[in-house]
Amino acid sequence: DMHEPSGDFERLALAIEKQWNIQGLKADLAIMRRLQPVLRKGDWKVTVAVYQSHDGATPRILDLWPGFYEGSIYGLAIDLGSTTIAAHLCDLRDGSILASSGLMNPQIRFGEDLMSRVSYAMMNPGGDVEMTKAVRNALNYLADVIATEGGIDASSIYEMVFVCNPVMHHLLLGIDPVELGQAPFALATSGAVHITARDLEVTSVNVAAQVYILPCIAGHVGADCAAVALAEEPNKSKDLVLIVDVGTNAEILLGNESRVLACSSPTGPAFEGAQISSGQRAAPGAIERVEIDPITKEPRFRVIGRDAWSDDPNFAELIKDTGVTGICGSGIIEAVAELRMSGLLDAGGLMGSAEQTGTNRMIPQGRTHSYMLYDGTTQGGPLIMVTQGDIRAIQLAKSALYAGARLLMDEMGVDHVDRVVLAGAFGAHISPKHAMVLGMIPDAPLDKVFSAGNAAGTGARIALCSKSARAEIEATVGLIHKVETAIEPRFQEHFVNANAIPHFTDPFLLLRAIAPLPNVSFNTQSGGGEGGRRRKR
């Protein structure tokens, strides 16, 4: 219309306002450059992808197509963990998951745990930049991989939602995490973050893709814990629920509709197979389940990817494609718990000798003994042992986990909880009974211990698909009270008491009613043979 001075964008914005009540629409220059050809190709009919934030920020056009576009648009929900990066590819029309994928966090080469990475940044000028580049490269790769698995073009990904612990949060954003390594553990920002994928140098997705990062709760309690709270909703529970997100850095929530507490506990990577002599990440061929006969002391096990136990006559044939390659986190937890229940391991965490235990599977190694779980050396495979060092690594990890939970219970003024929820991608595979035998979690009825799977990833997916959920979690984190384990003297007391298996002072009466905990002690001198003298404590 020669008599209508408005530009094509202004007319489009007015039409969208009239039809969809979306006001104040904006568009980047890249959209402006495409606008007129698209409008004319579609004979002034157009489909527009609009990003409209829950907080009233300016709505923006992300993409447009001539005529009626019937294709889908997609989003990524990403749990950016210290050890692994897990992602869900979701159809933004209905929230369905097209594909899920993950990879190891490449920052592991700079340090296996969070404080090691903070130290790397402190000690090496530009170290934070190196770690930021590594994780961003991994995200580009992961986006391409998951798009291929989902059968879509990565350029159809228009939004990414991240949940992560505070150190990963800062490194993702390119913020030096040094302040998180020293009191008062100050975050550069604790609120939700709205940016673009370009800001994070994630270029494999759509050029206009938006990024939302959930808010952090406090200095050591991050957006991953907020995502768990969003998924599990302890603030809406009438029962007192303890939620433990098991990982390299455990996040713990305790609460009900009256009050919610949170803390972070530095468990380290042992639960994920690291720092274990035959440890590996969960993958086909890794031992994931273990049982030890309390009479014969003989083991049997299962590996990831096969349902058969190792005492199955056809086991060798069934695992010929994968073999037995090592032991993952759930496997080492069950192995240590089974050693305790079969009387091969005492409450203090010491393993006995062959003479003390009556089994030649106890192999002397210097001044300690190890339990031979599997010997595949005659077929060119590995010798998989549970060593005294493995036991100690698990003791330290589980003590940190228990101490964090117990600290929250002290703050709440309770000795028992109504429900326990094991969360995290790894938490989904933990046997509640074996976790209780180890003393990873406080004593509770086994039928009140549940697995929530990767609750942080679930929370990320909820936030990806729901604007109201984003508003809800932003309000909820302000009501969660954070307990700082690093400066709380009772944490160390609880940690020391939790070194025993299951515990030095807590009798674990509910556990003892269903699981044998033999009253054995190997902290003595034993006769003859290498390794006969036990280490004293």
Residue ranges and their predicted role:
Residues 106-148, 275-276, 284-293, 393-396, ...:
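N-terminal phosphate-binding loop and adjacent alpha-helix
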Residues 256-261, 275, 406, 410-477:
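Catalytic phosphate/nucleotide-handling subdomain of diverse soluble enzymes
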Residues 85-103, 158-159, 163-191, 335-338, ...:
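Carboxylate/His-rich catalytic cores and anion/metal-binding grooves
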Residues 203, 216-231, 395-399, 449-484:
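Glycine-rich phosphate-binding/hydrolytic loop that grips phosphoryl groups
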Residues 78-82, 87-115, 178-194, 227, ...:
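Glycine-rich phosphate-binding loop of actin/hexokinase-like ATP-binding domains
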Residues 1-77, 82, 131-136, 140, ...:
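Nucleotide/phosphate-binding catalytic cleft detector across ATP-hydrolyzing
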Residues 340-410:
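A contiguous, well-structured pocket-lining segment that forms one wall/lid of small-molecule binding clefts
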Residues 164-179, 255, 361-364, 414, ...:
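Short glycine/threonine-rich loop-to-helix capping motif typified by GTGT followed
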